[in-house]
Every structure is written in C-alpha cells, then in structure tokens.
Amino acid sequence: MSYLFFSFEGPEGAGKTTIVRMLKDYLSEQHVDVVATREPGGIDIAEQIRAVILHPNNERMDARTEALLYAAARRQHLVEKVIPALKDGKVVLCDRFIDSSLAYQGVARGLGIDEILAINAFAIENWMPILTIYFDIDPSLGLARIRENGSREVNRLDLEELSFHEQVRKGYMVLLDRFPNRIKKVDATQPITKVFEDVWALIEPLIRK
C-alpha cells in the first residue's frame, strides 16, 4: 500500500509551518482526510522532549545527546500519530522529519550524515515520506523573519550563530543532491501565495494518483 506521507523542511524562518497550515486547510476544504503535525512534537511525550531540546537554558547540550533526543521524539511521534493516520488512509503533512536531523546534527553539528542516518534507521524503520519539500532561504533572511514575528517564541536553535544556520542550509543542499527523487526544492523568498502554488504543484499529482 502506498501511503501519502509528506514532510516539509527548511532553515529557521523559511515559512514551511505556514504552508503546512495552508495545505491542511486547502485539503480539508476538498474533503481530503488530512493530518498536520510537527517534529519534534505532535504528541505529548514528543512535546516534552521538544521542550528539553529547544529550551534556551540548555546550551550545554551535547550534539550526540541532541541527536538521540530528536530520534526518540521522532520514534514516539511516528508510532503514536503518523503510522496510525497513514494506515487509516489519511494524508499526513509533517513539519520536519528525518532530514532536519541530517542537516542540523549531521552537517551543522558535524556528526556526519551516515551516523545520523544510522541512529534514525533504528527509530523510524522503513517509514519515510514519499515526498519531502525543502524551503530554501538565505539564513540571514530567515532569522530576520523570526525577529519580526513577535508571536514566535525564540528557541535555543534560533540563538545559534549565523554560521551554524549557514551550515544547516549547506546540509540541506547536500541532501538535495543525495536524495533527488524524494527531496524537491522551492524558493521560500517568493510571496507566500506563490510558494503555496509551487508546493501544491508537487503534491497534487501524488494525491490525485
């Protein structure tokens, strides 16, 4: 059985969360059974892990600890929310998934993509999105968006140096080259309506199939 599992990736401030919300509303209006969720989080246990990972006071957190916590949250979220929804025939829209760990911990933290893949292979088994959409934006612009958005709580990753976020973007570029069939890029600097159109053009053929 083919599951309609989509993930959305990008640096901080890329606008993917807004697009996920717009997609959920659009699909619901068309009477498509859809679940929108996020990582880390989406369910109670994973939200508690999220709070630990992203708390600004936890700047001493070791990179491997961070990677393992993300994988633990991912596992619980997957078995408790994502897999049941997919088995029920629902479309799942996930704001971040494994590629965040590959870009942030694998590349930006310097742990290595293959090492993070190994950790996450244990966590997710064979459950992978059929399509991952990467929202590309210059990190300085993304961080400026966050500063301008007074309703968004600043977390530990937002407080990293610009050089860290530049490495995250570099990591995503590596992933685009490594997984070209699954990961597709959209220009997140465009007006939000154009970004939505580009995203929908990628998703619609898979949903209508």
UniProtKB/Swiss-Prot annotation:
HAMAP family, sorted: Thymidylate_kinase
What function does this protein fulfil? Phosphorylation of dTMP to form dTDP in both de novo and salvage pathways of dTTP synthesis.
Which reaction is catalysed here? Answer: dTMP + ATP = dTDP + ADP
- Report the GO terms under cellular component: cytosol
GO terms, molecular function: ATP binding; dTMP kinase activity
PROSITE patterns, A to Z: THYMIDYLATE_KINASE (PS01331)
* Binding of ATP, residues: G10, P11, E12, G13, A14, G15, K16, T17
Keyword vocabulary terms for this entry: ATP-binding, Kinase, Nucleotide biosynthesis, Nucleotide-binding, Transferase
Swiss-Prot/TrEMBL GO biological process terms? dTDP biosynthetic process; dTTP biosynthetic process; dUDP biosynthetic process
List the lineage, top down.
Answer: Bacteria, Bacillati, Bacillota, Bacilli, Bacillales
Full protein name: Thymidylate kinase
The family classification in the record reads: Belongs to the thymidylate kinase family.
The organism encoding this protein is Anoxybacillus flavithermus (strain DSM 21510 / WK1)
Principal EC category: transferase
- One Pfam family, please name it: Thymidylate_kin
Enzyme nomenclature, EC number: 2.7.4.9
